[in-house]
Amino acid sequence: MKQNPKISLIGSGNIGGTLAHLISLRELGDIVLFDVTEGVPQGKALDLMQAGTIAGSDINIKGTNDYKDIEGSDAIIITAGLPRKPGMSREDLISINTGIMKTVAANVKKYAPDAFVIVITNPLDVMVYVMLKESGLPHNKVIGMAGVLDSSRFNLFLAEEFKVSVSNVNSMVLGGHGDAMVPLARYSTISGVPIPDLIKMGLSSNENIEKIIDRTRNGGGEIVALLKTGSAYYAPAASAIEMLESYLKDKRQILTCAAHLQGEYGVHDLYVGVPIMIGKEGVLRVIELQLTTEEKALFDKSVEGVKKLIETIK
């Protein structure tokens, strides 16, 4: 009998639990649900296993507080970390979550050095960098979930603007996972037709698209403002699953993720959101887009923002 891939989820909060549910429903592999809080991963694992019986899923889900249980994982998704609370500075958040990420990285290095690692913890571009440096894993095996989520938001808003199915929309968002991200209308299409061409046809306007770009940049903040006590978790989880599935099934999908750049786009030793191809070896290649002077300036500004955040942990 073929053995299922082993997928470990570090952090059993809203995103971790949603990830486990989606993995179980899609039967992508057996799951280890880890958390430092006793009872939480065990309780969620039991609940999810019971839900699986209704869906007909035979996926095994184990809840644990022991890092040893992630041993031999094929893939690991990390959501562990504190959310930003009112009155907490970004620097405070970086400091606390860097400490958490160092502990996670040490255990990944010890128990699962061959795993493909997806980081979701914020501030994303810094946390995935810490994971790479502290774990010693090859850079093609450590990526951050960023652009898939940002593009999903851009896709939805574009579908609403053009009154088409979301399946007709393909969009591109580059840069850091924050306010300075760069949604690219020129590389975004409706059934293959670029957005600028659709504007020329009178189906939208530059003003409307700019509003959509601004809304995309603030996509996470909009949800936080509505929820008041938390942040998005369904779409972030669905985005990470897309990345995970491309790796496990060698789908070689081109997805925008936080990838470790080594000269591409003129960036060295930083994690920035760019299109990459994901297959069974991890990151197979970085896709370098030809950017206009204006687009490159926005991208470079976003990169500078990431650099400044990285400086705070050095």
UniProtKB/Swiss-Prot annotation:
Q: What does this protein do?
A: Catalyzes the reversible oxidation of malate to oxaloacetate.
Q: What is this protein called?
A: Malate dehydrogenase
Q: Which reaction does it catalyse?
A: (S)-malate + NAD(+) = oxaloacetate + NADH + H(+)
Q: State the organism named in the record.
A: Rickettsia africae (strain ESF-5)
| InterPro entries documented for this protein | L-lactate/malate_DH, Lactate/malate_DH_C, Lactate/malate_DH_N, Lactate_DH/Glyco_Ohase_4_C, Malate_DH_type3, NAD(P)-bd_dom_sf
Q: Which UniProt keywords apply?
A: NAD, Oxidoreductase, Tricarboxylic acid cycle
Pfam families, A to Z: Ldh_1_C (PF02866), Ldh_1_N (PF00056)
Cross-referenced PANTHER family, in alphabetical order? L-2-HYDROXYCARBOXYLATE DEHYDROGENASE (NAD(P)(+)), L-LACTATE DEHYDROGENASE
Residues involved in substrate binding: R84, R90, N122, R153
* Enzyme Commission number(s) of this protein: 1.1.1.37
| Top-rank lineage group of the source organism | Bacteria
